[in-house]
Regions:
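Aromatic-rich carbohydrate-binding modules that target alpha-glucans
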Residues: 385-441, 452-477
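Catalytic loop of the DD-peptidase/beta-lactamase superfamily, centered on the K-T-G motif
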Residues: 20-64, 111, 217-218, 222, ...
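Short active-site loop at a secondary-structure junction
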Residues: 31, 38-49, 69-131, 184-195, ...
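Short, surface-exposed loop or secondary-structure junction motifs
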Residues: 121-324, 329
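N-terminal leader/targeting segments and the immediately adjacent pre-domain N-terminus
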Residues: 14-77, 96-103, 133-140, 175, ...
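Extracellular Ig-like/FN3 beta-sandwich strand-entry sites
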Residues: 85, 442-444
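Sec-dependent N-terminal signal peptides
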Residues: 4-12
Length: 478
């Protein structure tokens, strides 16, 4: 009997494996080359660096040149400003403090701030550490306050931003912190704030009685072997040049506070080590840093991620970093053992959009492809009803799926439409039966499945009712 069950299990495993097309090393390298070619053209960057960690194997490559006409192609040791990727490192320090029980997520942040701040509460409700790491402090402004500078943003605005950063001291920071007002209940509204990250560094210094820079070295850099990653670089370290869209050499960032929001410099060689760490789902620090701290039914932020969501490839975490001269983006799919970092040495108003497009396209090329038979996918017509069916990959954590919706041209592409909320049939299957009369006959209707209201599922490669080009929507016809 045991032997029979073992054979049955092996057959089942083989069938499940057969439903996924293998992405070869050649596929990875070709996808990197295509992504770089497109990104060099679309972003107008001189240089593109791509790092990939896939199922434990690392791939890196560098394209173009740092300075136009000089032929100085980047390499794995080239040091770049990584800007807001720094926030992930700050988040990891808080994660360790929580796991070491030095702080609690539900602690009032004022417990760890030097001085008295009666203003850091809203109608008696204080800001907690949980609110702080989730960008939900309810601060009514950033520190320093850059609202006026952003109103009249132009090609030379960076000069004003740099001047402000150079003159903004810790003394000024704490004076301004006393004037912060909370505009809503902490923990209820996402609001990106660099000042809250700088405050986090101060809290960490008080908790550990060590400098933020020392904590980075002891708790992250040394443990992960990040030899090129530094907060305050040595005089002999050359930081890669970067440019704006007019190919004007741009200055490096300045920071007289703690540097916790965006002052780190690193290399692609170090960033792929960092990605390898972030893909280790068995590591308690990693698991906690990516955790859904509010049990959100949609997306969440873990510890200072831009956002973490669930789609048909499971959980994925994203972070963007933008300096005056460079931008970079990182994405990790822990359940798929895939992580990517892309760096460009240009920073302009369209750069982040091109970066995101590039990294999503690259991810799509590298993620497993369903090897299902060529057939209509996602729906069937039964009598007077259209029955939609979504099946989540059984190799992924189905507990992360809180809801699945059908969103389409027939209901305004609303991923939260309760009339198109699917019913869970088993651990991985969702169905929805809709009267056929809702769909105009002989008309092309487009749709997608959306997980947790935010994760738009990609159509299987072999779906015969998939759009060619565009958003690769699924097609429904009555």
């Amino acid at each position: 009997m045991k032997k029979y069950l073992l054979v049955l299990f092996m057959i089942s495993a083989l069938i499940c494996h057969a439903q996924q097309k293998t992405v070869t090393e050649k596929d990875v390298l070709l996808a990197m080359d295509k992504t770089a070619s497109d990104l060099l053209k679309n972003s107008k960057a001189n240089s593109v660096s791509i790092g990939i960690v896939k199922e434990g194997k690392t791939y890196t490559n560098h394209y173009g040149e740092i300075d136009k006409g000089k032929g100085n192609t980047a390499n794995n040791n080239t040091v770049f400003e990584i800007a807001s990727i720094t926030k992930l490192f700050t988040g990891l320090l808080v994660t360790q403090a929580v796991l070491e029980k030095k702080i609690s997520l539900d602690d009032d942040i004022r417990k760890y701030i030097t001085g008295t701040y009666p203003n850091l509460e809203y109608q008696g409700t204080p800001i907690t550490i949980r609110d702080l790491v989730s960008f939900k402090t309810a601060f009514n402004k950033d520190l320093p306050d850059t609202a006026e500078l952003r109103k009249n943003f132009n090609d030379t605005s960076y000069l004003a931003f740099k001047k402000l950063a150079e003159s903004y001291s810790r003394e000024k920071f704490f004076a301004d912190l006393k004037n912060i007002q909370l505009d809503t209940l902490p923990g209820t509204k996402f609001k990106y704030s660099n000042g809250s990250i700088q405050l986090t560094a101060h809290i960490l210094e008080n908790v550990y009685q060590k400098s933020y820079e020392t904590l980075l070295k002891e708790k992250i850099f040394n443990k992960l072997g990040l030899n090129a990653t530094q907060l305050n670089v040595s005089k002999d370290v050359i930081i890669a040049n970067g440019y704006n869209a007019k190919n004007i050499l741009m200055p490096k960032l300045s920071d007289n506070l703690w540097g916790a929001a965006g002052y780190l410099k690193s290399s692609l060689g170090d960033l792929v080590k960092f990605i390898t760490f972030e893909l280790d789902t068995k590591n308690k620090i990693v698991a906690e840093s990516q955790r859904n701290l509010y049990n959100s039914n949609t997306s969440w932020n873990g510890y200072f991620w831009d956002y973490i969501m669930v789609d048909n490839n499971g959980q994925n975490c994203r972070k963007h970093g933008g300096a005056f001269s460079t931008q970079n983006m990182m994405i990790v799919y822990p359940e798929r053992k895939l992580g990517i970092s892309v760096i460009v040495n240009i920073s302009d108003k369209n750069t982040s959009e091109e970066l995101e497009k590039a990294i999503i396209n690259l991810s799509t090329a590298l993620l497993p492809k369903s090897d299902l038979p060529k057939e209509i996918y996602g729906y069937k017509v039964q009598n007077d009803n259209v029955v939609f069916t979504y099946k989540h990959d059984k190799g992924l954590n189905s507990d992360l799926v809180k809801s699945v919706n059908v969103a389409g041209s027939f209901e305004g592409w609303n991923p939260r439409d309760k009339n198109y909320l699917m019913i869970k049939k088993d651990q991985a299957t969702y169905e929805l039966s809709v009267p056929k009369s809702r769909f105009e006959k002989d008309k092309t209707h487009l749709f997608k499945f959306v997980i947790n209201s935010t994760g738009w599922a990609e159509a299987p490669e072999n779906a015969t009712n998939k759009e060619n080009g565009g958003d690769n929507n699924l097609i429904l016809k009555i």
